[in-house]
Amino acid sequence: MALFDLRGRDFITTRDFTREELEYLIQMSMDLKKMWYSGIRVKPLEGKAIALLFKKPSTRTRNSFQAAVYRLGGFSVYMRPDELQLKRGEPIKDTARVLDRYYDALVIRTFGQDEIVEYARWMKNPVVNALSDEEHPCQAMADLMTIKEKFGYWEGLKLVYTGDVWNVAHSLIATAPVFGMDLTLAVPPGYEPLEEIWKFAEQEAARRGTKLEIVHDLKEAVKGADVVYANTWWSMGKPEETKEKRKKDFAPFTVTPEVMSLAKEHAIFMHCLPAYRGNEMTDEVIEGKWSVVFDQAENRLWTEAAILAAIIR
């Protein structure tokens, strides 16, 4: 595989990278994981300081980034906006330029992706999108790594996604066609992806000869699936008053053992977590033979480690 010099690049959306660059990062993730479990310790982030600025609560993203930085020899600082002068009205451009002098990279988890772009505009050091309302690129990288671990390839696999069409879905939509996978969204009517991301995916699917579709029947969607991917029905940032409507709309989309039996014999079940048992899937599925969700969660650490190791100068 070719080597790529990604130093100084921001990681805000996978759409900023080629298939070859993304595959390079995934291979690096797998190499770092293999070395760690073989007892080999590498420290590409030794002497580096990474800031984690999180507006949204987090279990996996915060802990995986902190563990990744530590395992690669670096040091991380976790901050909330209400602890900074941002709370009193300091503009992002001032905060960004100050943090740029103190840290070697900034990892941001927030609401609007335009805020992440604004930080990147004012910083020379790399900025990483740790989740916005629009996209969750680090999750998509962990998903791709997990699929590669389980199948050994991506091309020709059928991935079925069911759940809220929000950041995680958008990043899957943007990456699945690029890696040669067919993608089916199984969602109720009225739950549509962002037009910009769907158009990007349509172009990639047409270029690579893959299938991209939205269906409103989960059982029909999962027939012949290699990967069944469920997600919460109600994402962070969505209005509280929509919760009950969403539960009603998505009620026919619970992944059960019966649903999984319609997929291929070797099919795997994925979920980015947190999972709400009895809603998007039953306990029998997430704890059953199909589930790879905790391998998937671990791989967040390794893909984030690779991203940081590759882009930090």
Show where each model-derived region lies:
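Short, structured coil segments at secondary-structure junctions
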Residues: 72, 102, 122-124, 179, ...
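Glycine-rich phosphate/diphosphate-binding loop of Rossmann-like nucleotide-binding domains
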Residues: 55-67, 149-231
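Rossmann-like adenosine-cofactor binding region
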Residues: 203-283
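Adenosine-phosphate binding glycine-rich loop
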Residues: 266-267, 272-313
